[in-house]
């Protein structure tokens, strides 16, 4: 396994991050495709044995059971000082006005709840899952800084939002001498490259580690367009995002298939190699519900694309509507939070 620094920090992470969104009790909406604890543990062990030391989850995944399953497995299988555990906060998952978004109260409660579920006394990377329009940026950034100073959080990161909002949050922290974000977790893959316009150049300039979610476009990049799975049939976000863009995306998938066939490798190799050809990318967040998913992703680290193949892959891309970054309206009751909003990575 290869290891790199996470952004401009001294923290070393594996070139792949295991995304634990799919690990959780299936009856806990909104992820009915999730694997229960018994099915999840072998995959976490497989990741550890392959040298993956970076694990990402969130308080919202499967009603918190993702953190419980992930935390328990890591406590029993790994040394705490050898792994990097990341979680996220923003989306409300209880019917209460202060259990979501990014107020000081919500952030403090969220980290305590996450640490309890993980069974740990700190997390390495605490990320805001989305931008909160209802809370002053200063309140959010100072609260995150205070968590670092309290020892509950080692580093902070952010996820899908407009680049200018991310820059504003960073500037607010720098101006006040508070902890700055070291990572950005955007949606980025061969079928959705809108982040190349502003967010990725900003991250490269500022030394922000980019850990993209949905690197396989919810599996679309790994199979023929007509092939479906339980996930594609139940994932509201994927249905909205990719089914509506079939005419734009199918030519890209065809090129992925062609290059994979030429090299006699799985299509996932092409998707991962393309991501890792970008200097701004630190570690794609890989979801795995089968052992072969994980072994394929790991072996992709030894595969690379030629410059001509990268050009060929990118030439078919057409602009997409921006998606995955707009949170629910701040006055939306938590119980009415759209399921599609919390099925993102």
Predicted segments with their positions:
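Aromatic-lined glycan-binding groove of carbohydrate-active enzymes
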Residues: 194-231, 266
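Terminal-tail/helix-coil boundary detector
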Residues: 1-2, 41, 205, 229-262, ...
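Short, well-ordered coil/turn segments that N-cap beta-strands
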Residues: 11-16, 51-53, 79-83, 120-124, ...
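N-terminal binding-site loop/beta-alpha segment at the start of enzyme catalytic domains
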Residues: 1-83, 149
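Glycine/proline-rich, positively charged
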Residues: 26-27, 94-194, 198
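Generic structural signal for well-ordered alpha-helices
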Residues: 44, 67, 71, 111-115, ...
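Active-site-proximal loop/turn and secondary-structure-junction residues that shape catalytic pockets
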Residues: 22, 89-91, 129-132, 160-162, ...
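Conserved, mostly hydrophobic/aromatic
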Residues: 6, 18, 40, 55, ...
